[in-house]
Every structure is written in structure tokens, then in C-alpha cells.
Amino acid sequence: MTMTDPIADMLTRLRNANSAYHDTVSMPYSKLKSHIAEILQAEGYITSWTVEDAEVGKKLTLDLKFGPNRERAIAGLRRVSKPGLRVYAKSTNLPRVLGGLGVAILSTSSGLLTDKQANKKGVGGEVLAYVW
């Protein structure tokens, strides 16, 4: 069976593993998911990510980040633009997550960017997800 929204599946797996205090979470690999993982690592929400060969295709594994007392680095995740309702933002109207404390992940003509990077470049695009 095909998956209609692989990004939502990735965020759900990440949210569930984070809630259960798992150290790692695995999911089917795609280039888009690996770019999202790069952003999550650069923003400090995950420790690292790796791509492994599986029996069928490739597998993306994320190492979750926790604080000294097992506090979660990711407080919340939300899929914004969905297959049934796409959400776009102009460069002049980019979303701010929790007043700048969180990150909005955008798909732009310059690739996947955070809201801050898109603001610096002056580009808008599809708002994929919020992470805080």
C-alpha cells in the first residue's frame, strides 16, 4: 500500500518515539526526509541521523536528543501543509513558531529552509511543518 503523506508519517514516528523516550527512530528513506533530518540536527532537535541499507530500499535512522534529566529536546511537531490542503507563505509573511523559539520548515525554490533562512534569502514557499 502506498503512503499518501510520507512527511506526516515521519513526523508521527518522531513524535511517538519522542513521547516514549526512545533513543532512536527508523523510517523508510527519502531525499526529502533526509533534508528534514539535516534541518532538525542543525537546529539542535536531534543528535544525528544515518542512512542504512535495509532488506528492501534504504532506512533513515534518527538519534533523538534528550536533556540531562531525560527532558525532550522536541516539545512538539505539527504538519502544516497537507496533501488535501497546501499552505504557502510569501517571503513577507513567513510564519514564526512560538515567537521565534520554534522552527518552521519550508520547501522553497532554494531547497528546504527554516523560516529564518528563508527570511534572510527573501524567499517564500510551502510550509511543511512546525517544530518546537
Swiss-Prot record:
Q: Which organism is it from?
A: Kineococcus radiotolerans (strain ATCC BAA-149 / DSM 14245 / SRS30216)
Query: RNA-binding: present as a keyword of the record?
Result: yes
GO terms classed as biological process: translation
- An example Pfam family from this entry, by short name, is Ribosomal_S8
Sample GO molecular function, one term = structural constituent of ribosome
Q: What does the subunit section of this Swiss-Prot or TrEMBL entry state?
A: Part of the 30S ribosomal subunit. Contacts proteins S5 and S12.
Keywords assigned by UniProt? Answer: Ribonucleoprotein, Ribosomal protein, RNA-binding, rRNA-binding
Q: Name one GO cellular component term.
A: ribosome
Per its UniProt record, what NCBIfam families does this chain match?
PRK00136.1
UniProt keyword annotation of Endoplasmic reticulum present: no
InterPro entries to which the protein is assigned, alphabetical:
Ribosomal_uS8, Ribosomal_uS8_sf
The free-text function statement in the UniProt record for this protein reads: One of the primary rRNA binding proteins, it binds directly to 16S rRNA central domain where it helps coordinate assembly of the platform of the 30S subunit.
* Protein name as catalogued: Small ribosomal subunit protein uS8
Gene3D superfamilies named among the record's database cross-references: 3.30.1370.30, 3.30.1490.10
Q: Which family does it belong to?
A: Belongs to the universal ribosomal protein uS8 family.
